[in-house]
């Protein structure tokens, strides 16, 4: 029985889809003005994990993740680059998809782009105006009337009165209330724009997600996800817009993943500790980065550091060493491990406990590998099967363990030295065997002897 922590209720709840076995999930995607940073990677991996487990559990999932392809940041960056906004976004979308592919992230079922849904935004804005939840002051903008929506603050637990007292909001004479937010922005010189009933302009950020989610999934759906930094004001505003327009509950459950911290500090460009996914993948194997992002609980903050990446690499090496040398066969046995893994994942996608189960499974594989190869191979298949839920352990063991060797050592030379060492050992020429081992160690190669065979990997 799956339970999910619902940010709306602030409790774990038994997950019950609105429509039988069908699950509809919407996740706020990228604003594509730059390369994806590590925080984007965290969200991508977190909801990829949710996707994999829901499908593994037998649910019929429709996963929608949007692309924000018109925004102040996009316009500013395109102007800086001297290119059109759509040329910039096309490049960044291609780069985002490449980052996802390298991190083994399954593509969403639908990936709507804001600029393809302008007509739907016009329709929802007009509905809000007709119901008294929005107003057009005549300057080309349209604003949402926050004070009219009775449930405002129910997601973030913020009170309108407190927001008014504590907010340092830029004064806008066109607003009836400082808390009102923009639904449609009147055109400005040099900016892209679309025709609308209120004059040319472009949509506000919040209305984009309300329209794309309900267009793809209906007026009410099961799960809405995103980073914890989006809880307020973005997701709060989505609820206000959508529920005022439809009169129905917007999303049944809200899921928010934690942030990335760099050596214990918030990641930011001002602190000079800002990393794109591409930056990190230049130094570390993609599976190491993915394991770092998936091994912590999705609601927890992740501390990104050289130590945490070394720990992730070490964990994967333990897994792949257990798989190494065993025939690749279908999963067999280990039902108790499967049950424990399922219990962990059904408890709000508890990956730390799930990973602990994998380590226990590795110990059992290593215990059996010399005495019962068939049983060990069946459990190795089980390890790969469970690892696939986390999006890891699908490579050939040698390919992972030797990753990074290209350009650092000559694999053919290493293999030749290993064969020479095996001959020296067979001839009981221990001095020559030790000399070759020392030579390989100096090359950064670690040897592992087992039953007359020797395998190798690069040292950390």
Curated annotation (Swiss-Prot):
Catalytic activity: tRNA(Cys) + L-cysteine + ATP = L-cysteinyl-tRNA(Cys) + AMP + diphosphate
Cofactor(s), names only, from the UniProt record: Zn(2+)
Keywords tagged on the record: Aminoacyl-tRNA synthetase, ATP-binding, Cytoplasm, Ligase, Metal-binding, Nucleotide-binding, Protein biosynthesis, Zinc
Residues noted as binding Zn(2+) in the record, renumbered to the chain: 28, 209, 234, 238
SMART domains xrefs: DALR_2
GO CC term, one of those recorded: cytosol
A molecular function GO annotation: zinc ion binding
Location within or outside the cell: Cytoplasm
Recorded superkingdom: Bacteria
EC number: 6.1.1.16
Signal peptide: none
Pfam families, alphabetized: CysS_C, DALR_2, tRNA-synt_1e
Position of sequence motif 'HIGH' region: 30-40
Cofactor note: Binds 1 zinc ion per subunit.
GO BP of this protein: cysteinyl-tRNA aminoacylation
Main location: cytoplasm
Enzyme class name: ligase
Span of the annotated motif 'KMSKS' region: 266-270
Binding site residues for ATP: 269
Family per similarity comment: Belongs to the class-I aminoacyl-tRNA synthetase family.
Assembly: Monomer.
HAMAP family xref list: Cys_tRNA_synth (MF_00041)
Name this polypeptide is given: Cysteine--tRNA ligase
Organism: Pseudomonas putida (strain ATCC 47054 / DSM 6125 / CFBP 8728 / NCIMB 11950 / KT2440)
Gene symbol of the encoding locus: cysS
């Amino acid at each position: 029985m799956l339970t999910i922590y619902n940010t709306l209720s602030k409790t774990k709840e038994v997950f019950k889809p609105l429509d039988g076995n069908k699950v509809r999930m919407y996740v706020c995607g990228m604003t594509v003005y730059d390369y994806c940073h590590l925080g984007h990677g965290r969200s991508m991996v977190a909801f990829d994990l949710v996707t994999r487990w829901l499908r593994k559990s037998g649910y019929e999932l429709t996963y929608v993740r949007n692309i924000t392809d018109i925004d102040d940041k996009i316009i500013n960056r395109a102007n800086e680059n001297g290119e059109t906004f759509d040329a910039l976004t096309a490049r960044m979308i291609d780069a985002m998809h490449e980052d996802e592919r390298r991190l083994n992230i399954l593509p969403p079922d639908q990936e709507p782009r804001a600029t393809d849904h302008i007509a739907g935004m016009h329709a929802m804005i007009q509905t809000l105006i007709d119901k008294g939840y929005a107003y057009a002051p005549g300057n080309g903008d349209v604003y949402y009337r926050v004070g009219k929506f009775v449930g405002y603050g129910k997601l973030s637990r913020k009170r309108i009165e407190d927001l008014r007292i504590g907010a340092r909001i830029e004064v806008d004479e066109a607003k009836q209330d400082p808390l009102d937010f923009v639904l449609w922005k009147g055109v400005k010189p040099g900016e892209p724009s679309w025709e609308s009933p209120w004059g040319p302009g472009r949509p506000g950020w919040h209305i984009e997600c309300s329209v794309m989610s309900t267009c793809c999934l209906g007026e009410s759906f099961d799960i809405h996800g995103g980073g914890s930094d989006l809880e307020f004001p973005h997701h709060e505003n989505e609820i206000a817009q959508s529920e005022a327009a439809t009169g129905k509950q917007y999303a049944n459950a809200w899921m928010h993943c934690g942030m990335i911290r760099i050596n214990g500090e918030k990641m930011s460009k001002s602190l000079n500790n800002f990393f794109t996914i591409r930056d990190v993948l230049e130094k570390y194997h993609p599976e190491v980065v993915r394991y770092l992002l998936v091994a912590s609980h999705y609601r927890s903050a992740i501390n990104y550091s050289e130590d945490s990446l070394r720990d992730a690499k070490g964990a994967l090496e333990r897994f792949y060493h257990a798989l190494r040398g065993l025939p690749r066969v279908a999963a067999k046995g280990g039902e108790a491990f499967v049950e424990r893994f399922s219990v962990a994942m059904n408890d709000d996608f508890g990956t730390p406990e799930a990973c602990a189960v994998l380590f226990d499974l590795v110990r059992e594989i290593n215990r059996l590998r010399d005495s019962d190869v068939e049983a060990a191979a069946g459990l190795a298949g089980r390890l790969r099967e469970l690892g696939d839920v986390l999006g890891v352990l699908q490579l050939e063991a040698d390919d992972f363990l030797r990753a990074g060797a290209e350009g650092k050592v000559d694999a053919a030379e290493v293999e030749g030295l290993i064969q020479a060492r095996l001959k020296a050992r067979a001839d009981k020429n221990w001095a020559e065997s030790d000399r070759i081992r020392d030579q390989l160690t100096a090359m950064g190669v670690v040897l592992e002897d087992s039953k007359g065979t020797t395998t190798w990997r690069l040292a950390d």
